[in-house]
Amino acid sequence: MKERDSESFESLSHQVLPNTSNSTHMIQMAMANSGSSAAAQAGQDQPDRSKWLLDCPEPPSPWHELKRQVKGSFLTKAKKFKSLQKQPFPKQILSVLQAIFPIFGWCRNYKLTMFKNDLMAGLTLASLCIPQSIGYATLAKLDPQYGLYTSVVPPLIYALMGTSREIAIGPVAVVSLLISSMLQKLIDPETDPLGYKKLVLTTTFFAGIFQASFGLFRLGFLVDFLSHAAIVGFMGGAAIVIGLQQLKGLLGITNFTTNTDIVSVLRAVWRSCQQQWSPHTFILGCSFLSFILITRFIGKKYKKLFWLPAIAPLIAVVVSTLMVFLTKADEHGVKTVRHIKGGLNPMSIQDLDFNTPHLGQIAKIGLIIAIVALTEAIAVGRSFAGIKGYRLDGNKEMVAIGFMNVLGSFTSCYAATGSFSRTAVNFAAGCETAMSNIVMAVTVFVALECLTRLLYYTPIAILASIILSALPGLININEAIHIWKVDKFDFLALIGAFFGVLFASVEIGLLVAVVISFAKIILISIRPGIETLGRMPGTDTFTDTNQYPMTVKTPGVLIFRVKSALLCFANASSIEERIMGWVDEEEEEENTKSNAKRKILFVVLDMSSLINVDTSGITALLELHNKLIKTGVELVIVNPKWQVIHKLNQAKFVDRIGGKVYLTIGEALDACFGLKV
């Protein structure tokens, strides 16, 4: 078909086209001879559908749109409230409780068999949680008991308010690193541990307030500013930084840097290794690290032994503690945890410090922690909810996580969120509901009451080994390779976050990732793609000529589609210049191929992708129209959206182009050439 169109046009192109009307006539003959068009009369029998576009009602203003959305939100709630009023009072109370506390919904159908599964999952979870919580507390520069506190109250609150059945709540490595790396710049935890603890609790309070606000006001889109690629890079960089910091405990080093960048950490390790380090501590830590990693390999290979890697850290703690106690290794340079304060979480409302001179910085750090913690928790929750086949309510998750951190800050807990590694263990152990979190929290509480004295001789190197064993799960090389193959710009955000965390600091890594993500959005807005369209053979479908090389170009017509939702000040001039450039190139190319002068008569602009246009966009369209008219080319508009056609009418642009506005490209070509294409 393409060859027939070209041959027909070639037969006419040997004549010089003196004016537009003659050119149009000759193109019509070419198109008719090609057999790709019906008779002109067939086109005249069709209704003039362009009037539907031009006579459409006025679209709602932005103010009315905002009012409609707010009204719709309130009407939805009002309808729920009215339906609630029709119910008996006891059912009203139950419905309200279920909305706030989902546990009242699923506990009514709770069975003994489900509890057996949750009990096994909760106990398995606790065996992993207890040693990890102690290790993560030391990573956050807090006393070990604060990690255990964080594994008691937040999981209980989440079990009442959360919607995920599998997520395991507690302290995590990345949030612990964020807290220590940013807050120790304000107060040194070594010289002023009480002041540092107050900062941590106040930061946790702010993080919870931000998280709950995101859910209550439906501001979850703020979390999306950290793209998936940025999170992958950030997690990978943070994992390496955390691993390097654990060399202090693994080598038994006393003096260590407070910086988190890789250069400072490696320099500190090198200096310490030349002066003082404990071979006994290193051998002990590496031995149990190998043991934990081997059990993890066995658990992955044999699915029935999923419980083995889960209890391996607890076994490592118990065995190493007995070894140190029996051999008195603590007298030979092996550092131990020593005193861990037991008992129920003490109240800490009085420790929240809102009079500190660092309040502004604490609020900023709280916002960062809130976003990172929510991103991790919601990603984990949605992953496992998808496997189980149910929907996770993102807004309720934000509210639940926010309230658990606010209440956690009142009970000596630091920022908690969902842990991917522990959630995977919880899922593999066969958990049915959030009851597994309750079982885990009760088990940790029992450990706080009864077992803390037994941890006096637990080597710090073992805690470092437990943290190191959890880090490979944070480094997702396969996902990084996948991102590289799919989207190079996303991979740039990944690399920026990774190297930012690794060579600068955690907050710099996050900032780099967000800046690159914004830069991607801005570049796409400034330089949107423009497609040159052609007709698919034997159809009335017009598609991108680069994607589908078999498409047939219509002689004398250039058809463009702008791949952008907005035609605005940021991209209008660029789009105008590129279209004019293509028009000039097309005419030069056609003139080179044939000795006779071949004329472009129409430029058809498909606006089906555009949602809105501003005054700069309209000005650019006017300039494009004026430039095309000077070269004897007419501009035709196709399928503008409601807001777009309204603004073009208001600006009298439709009158300027002679009302050449059509619903489809085919109708535009029919009208231009008087033929049905």
Swiss-Prot record:
Q: Which residues are glycosylated?
A: 255
Residue spans with biased composition (Low complexity)?
28-44
Q: Which segments cross the bilayer?
A: 119-139, 142-162, 167-187, 199-219, 222-242, 279-299, 305-325, 361-381, 398-418, 427-447, 455-475, 491-511
User: Which segments sit on the Cytoplasmic face?
Assistant: 1-118, 163-166, 220-221, 300-304, 382-397, 448-454, 512-677
Q: What is one cellular component GO term in this UniProt entry?
A: membrane
Family that this chain belongs to: Belongs to the SLC26A/SulP transporter (TC 2.A.53) family.
Q: What induces it?
A: In roots by sulfate starvation or after selenate treatment.
Name the Gene3D superfamilies for this protein. STAS domain (3.30.750.24)
**Stretch list, region Disordered:** 23-54
Keywords per UniProt: Glycoprotein, Membrane, Sulfate transport, Symport, Transmembrane, Transmembrane helix, Transport
Q: Which GO terms describe its biological process?
A: sulfate transmembrane transport
Task: Cite the PANTHER family for this sequence.
Answer: SULFATE TRANSPORTER
Task: Output the SUPFAM superfamilies linked to this UniProt entry.
Answer: SpoIIaa-like
> What exactly does this protein do?
Low-affinity H(+)/sulfate cotransporter that may be involved in root-to-shoot translocation of sulfate. Plays a central role in the regulation of sulfate assimilation.
Lineage: superkingdom: Eukaryota
Q: How does it sit in the membrane?
A: Multi-pass membrane protein
Q: Where is the organism placed in the taxonomic lineage, from the top?
A: Eukaryota, Viridiplantae, Streptophyta, Embryophyta, Tracheophyta
Query: What GO molecular functions are on record for this protein?
Result: secondary active sulfate transmembrane transporter activity; sulfate transmembrane transporter activity; symporter activity
The record's principal subcellular location, in a coarse class, is: membrane
Where found, per UniProt?
Membrane
Which gene specifies this protein's sequence? Answer: SULTR2;1
Expression (tissue specificity) = Expressed in root cap, central cylinder of roots and in vascular tissues of leaves.
**CDD domains, from UniProt?**
STAS_SulP_like_sulfate_transporter
| Protein name in the entry | Sulfate transporter 2.1
Q: What range(s) does the STAS domain occupy? A: 548-672
Q: Which residues lie on this side of the membrane: Extracellular?
A: 140-141, 188-198, 243-278, 326-360, 419-426, 476-490
